[in-house]
Amino acid sequence: MKISDLGYDESFLDLFEGNDFELYDHQRMAIEQFRKGKNIMVSVPTAAGKTLIAYSAIYETFKKKLKSIYIVPLRSLAMEKYEELSRLRELGMRVKLSIGNYDDTPDFIKRYDVVILTSEKADSLMHHDPYMMEEVGLMVIDEIHMIGDEYRGPTLETVITTARYVNPETRIIALSATVSNASEIAEWLNASLIKSSFRPVPLKVGILYRNRLFLDGDARSDVDINLLVKETVDDGGQVLIFVSSRKRAEDMAKNLSQLFDPINDLKVSSEDANVYDDLLNEMLPHGVSFHHAGLSNEQRSFIEKAFRHRKLKVIVATPTLAAGVNLPARLVIVKDVTRYGDLGITYLSNMEVKQMIGRAGRPGYDQYGIGIIYAASANSYQVVKEYISEEPEPVDSYIGKPEKVRFNTLAAIAMGLATSQVEMEEFYRSTFYYAQNGEDEIPNRINESIKFLKENGFIKEKDSLRATEFGKMISNLYIDPESAIILKKYFDDNDDIDTALYYISLCREIAPINMQDDYAAMEFLESIGHIDGDIEAAKTALVLREWISEASTRRIFEMYGVAPGDLQARVNNADWISYSLAHLASIFKPERRRKLEILNMRIKEGIREELMDLVLIPAIGRVRARRLYEAGIHNVQELAFSDPSRIKMLYGFSDTLANAVVKRAKAIVSERIR
């Protein structure tokens, strides 16, 4: 069967540049099952054509005048998928990406045909109105095996459960990597399972041990990683190498860059004096880079784009890249099969290693992919052999953890999906957790959650369970009830900024900062009257204070050891928690609300208060706003009446940008006058 045999308009074929190719067996079977009204679970290797299945289902749903939502586990994947699915506009569909602001209501969905969401965003929208699912005809769940992730999995499972609970008629297409219990997940979804080991680009998997490469039934001596990388790049291929730590990624990339002469003029330049710029710029011209979560979002995007466009030949990355964006390469090397964590040194899971080596082989460029796992010792050699010979671990549910039950219990009561413990238990019977474990401890945990929520003012009970104003707000704001209790205490404390930053930093949504200097944190706690307070939260508050005082990311790294990517992650969460704190003021201390709204904007933008007006202009961030301010342009009105030729003289402003910001400032001033 070819694409043209599907019976679609010719415009559908245009999505594939008019290439009327033969469908793979798993694509044909999935489309046939979907047309029979079935839910579908597709479990196939990476780059095996899952996107065509989604396109087909979305198109058929659109023809029925129904909406589709496409759910992914990570923001980076959502942006990548949005770029891909935006092509559906050529078929007349309205496509929307929504990944920010967890306080949005789902009303906007009515204006679109296809909406791409992270699982957290989808869950937060359902907190506002779960019945949005009544307008959704199709839910595509990408990377459904992520329900087995201890941290992100429960949210994805909650989204799927809520959607099916509210509207059992919503069709589901679940896309998965190869997992050993795919049939168990498919049964939970009431879905037809389409399982295949087919890869369009064949994969060869080998082991590098004691300078011997065992690959494809052959053994080759005197081989090391440098040699394999050099051979692959010289032959026109690209290489991904996975290592266990950021420092190892940086050091290895620097060493590998010395193997190659300069081949491009790539240069990264961060507006905010980023600490990694110099190191990256040493190696980028040689076609080599590192990639880890300490880099800023902009730096990571720059590296990923350069690799896709084949300007970069080698990336040395930490495992976070394997779970993120799709970056295939001819050769993938798993250099480290262990990691250091809370439990000491542990081996990577089979699933993680399979995800890494599964990226080997770039369709359209490579005839085959090569995945090589490095064994550093006799013990790891035995483990590596098991990675190759055994199936990935089964996917298990984590939605039954007490804190997840508590979060979901408040949400279900606030949404009106449950008004009693019996109804809450009924909701949990629709979860994958129940499919795997039966009742287990769930009734007890629901009972404990209800007791906790009543005692702390989130819900009340007369004839039935109902959310209080406080409980409803917390559910809509999408924050943990324990964090809400912490924030509530702030309103009985001082109203200064440092105290607010401390309470924000206490919340579980903000990961603690690994900083050695306890003395500065103790001084901070003493200054706000919390001498016996939480040292780790105080460290985070100190970093946030530097951020809103306009310290550069380089200075924050030098002072506190917080890398730009880690800073961005904490700022993003602190932005959300401070937004929530400002909203809670309307219940507990309305007179503090305006001050907290100002703090929220300062955290969001990383600015002092006097720059708040200027950063309303798109493309003007904290650095450009400060340059304008120091040049005597203090607000939007003054910018609107400025000569662009004066602005373009400032560092960081091109002629085009200067004209654009003045034009936008004029528009804002005009709107304010009306």
Swiss-Prot record:
SMART domains noted in UniProt: DEXDc (SM00487), HELICc (SM00490)
BP GO annotations: DNA repair
CDD domains: SF2_C_Ski2
Residue window of motif DEAH box: 142-145
SUPFAM superfamilies reported for this sequence: P-loop containing nucleoside triphosphate hydrolases, Sec63 N-terminal domain-like, Winged helix' DNA-binding domain
Root EC class: isomerase
The keyword Ribonucleoprotein belongs to this UniProt entry's keyword annotation: no
Domain Helicase ATP-binding: from-to ranges: 31-197
Signal peptide residues on this chain, from the entry's feature table: none
Ranges where the Helicase C-terminal domain occurs: 224-411
UniProt-recorded Gene Ontology molecular function terms: 3'-5' DNA helicase activity; ATP binding; ATP hydrolysis activity; DNA binding
Enzymatic reactions: Couples ATP hydrolysis with the unwinding of duplex DNA by translocating in the 3'-5' direction; ATP + H2O = ADP + phosphate + H(+)
Function of the protein: DNA-dependent ATPase and 3'-5' DNA helicase that may be involved in repair of stalled replication forks.
Subunit structure: Monomer.
Record-stated family: Belongs to the helicase family. Hel308 subfamily.
Record's protein name: ATP-dependent DNA helicase Hel308
Organism: Thermoplasma volcanium (strain ATCC 51530 / DSM 4299 / JCM 9571 / NBRC 15438 / GSS1)
